[in-house]
Amino acid sequence: MGAVCVDSSVCTIIETVNTPLYIVADPAEISGIERDSLLVTRVGTLNCAFALIDALTTARIHGNLPSRLVNVGTAGALVDGLSGVFEISHVLKHDFSNDAIAAITGHPYPNGIDLDVSGLLPTARLATGDSFIGDSASRERISRQASLVDMEGYVVALAGQRFGIPVTLLKDVSDNADDKAAGTWTDALPASSRRLMEALEALAL
């Protein structure tokens, strides 16, 4: 299965069976990538969900599900001193009140997915949500659950779980999820893109 997409509504499916599908929110996050199977979802959980489910549903209909979902992109550091690329070992949704909903409904609502890792890169826990974290209060709150924060990773992990496809999440630290984050993210992209490409090569993906 192959997909080259410029946004969530324009996606061309190509016949490249049993290969990984590479997923990015913004093409600048991995500008040097040359892959037959690249899905650009745009930023945010809903954009990612619609683009990814469209691609995977079409692929399943044609019997061309990818061998692995590989999400590469940037993340904010919730803990001081983090830098470089991390392979995600656990991902959760930081803006989903699963405990409160479980108490109200009487049914469990799990919020967290464990992922297998290669052992070749540093690992981290990732929190996903639809807010760009750029204030100290939010940073401190979310840091109780994870050390990195992004806006798509949990969606990719959940889609992989639902479709029975292995998942790899690679996140490069682009900012410190603080009041300077919005101003530093764009400047960090070229170096982040290069490091993510090096990580893909290290994992032979």
Question: Across the structure, where does each feature detected by a protein language model lie?
Answer:
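Glycine-rich phosphate- or other oxyanion-binding loops that anchor nucleotides, phosphorylated ligands
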Residues: 27-205
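Extreme N-terminal starter segment of soluble prokaryotic enzymes
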Residues: 16-21
